[in-house]
Amino acid sequence: MQTYLTLLETLLTTGVDKSDRTGVGTRSLFGYQMRFDLAAGFPLLTTKKMHFKSIVYELLWFLSGNTNIAYLNQNGVSIWDEWADKNGDLGPIYGKQWRNWAGRDQIHQVLTSLKTNPDSRRMLVSSWNVAQLEEMALPPCHVLFQFYVANGRLSCQLYQRSADVFLGVPFNIASYALLTMMMAQQADLELGDFVWTGGDVHLYRNHFAQAQEQLKRQPYPLPKMHIKRAKSIDDYVFEDFLLVDYRCHAAIKAPVAV
């Protein structure tokens, strides 16, 4: 994941200092892209320990269409707690938009197209439902993703409008890489690339020291991901995912900007 470390270094050395909604302040740049060959390994950061369980359970939660944190909490995942209301609800965020945007199941539509019309340029899933943004606890940061098939290989590109590079981006890369692997499996396709594209790409000011610490670390080889094939995209469970040969440096704690 040297590609990610290059982004950290670029932000620290050439980014622009800006104010932001949270009041913490950021150093940011606009427009950045990284590419990961999924056949070469699972792009899970090795220069700090990542909480793999949270990545998997959150993705399964999105795919279920659920927007209440009860399922996450029951499985020891607390990453959405700060934004939930007293009942655990988050409003019509990612899962709702993916699986039921005005009655449309975007995930099912893309899977159908992958199987029947893989050259389509319309294989997109969007979470940016303008009519419902004010009902969401947090407007989508990872807004839109598109699939592309070439030579029997499935690739995915994500557009992330707001990218918290230290905490959020490594998590998002792994999550969408995993989703791409699941979609490829369900559509009987080989693995292509995961392309991450960021809009406002930023480091919070209270993450500078952590980023500098991470830059001192040498990346390890990427782990492998083994997925037991489920009957459908809706039938995967946590136990279907096996992370193999994940060697990493120690975790680096950093505060979440709410």
Curated annotation (Swiss-Prot):
It holds the Pfam family Thymidylat_synt. The active site is at C141. PANTHER family: THYMIDYLATE SYNTHASE, THYMIDYLATE SYNTHASE 1. Homodimer. DUMP binds at R21, R121, R122, R161, S162, A163, D164, N172, H202, L203, Y204. It catalyses: dUMP + (6R)-5,10-methylene-5,6,7,8-tetrahydrofolate = 7,8-dihydrofolate + dTMP. It comes from Dichelobacter nodosus (strain VCS1703A). This is Thymidylate synthase. It comes from the Bacteria. Pathway: Pyrimidine metabolism; dTTP biosynthesis. Its main location: cytoplasm. InterPro entries: Thymidate_synth/dCMP_Mease (IPR045097), Thymidate_synth/dCMP_Mease_dom (IPR023451), Thymidate_synth/dCMP_Mease_sf (IPR036926), Thymidylate_synthase (IPR000398), Thymidylate_synthase_AS (IPR020940). Its EC number is 2.1.1.45. Catalyzes the reductive methylation of 2'-deoxyuridine-5'-monophosphate (dUMP) to 2'-deoxythymidine-5'-monophosphate (dTMP) while utilizing 5,10-methylenetetrahydrofolate (mTHF) as the methyl donor and reductant in the reaction, yielding dihydrofolate (DHF) as a by-product. This enzymatic reaction provides an intracellular de novo source of dTMP, an essential precursor for DNA biosynthesis. (6R)-5,10-methylene-5,6,7,8-tetrahydrofolate binds at H51, D164, A257. Belongs to the thymidylate synthase family. Bacterial-type ThyA subfamily. One of its GO terms (cellular component) is cytosol. Keywords: Cytoplasm, Methyltransferase, Nucleotide biosynthesis, Transferase. GO terms for molecular function: thymidylate synthase activity. One of its GO terms (biological process) is methylation.
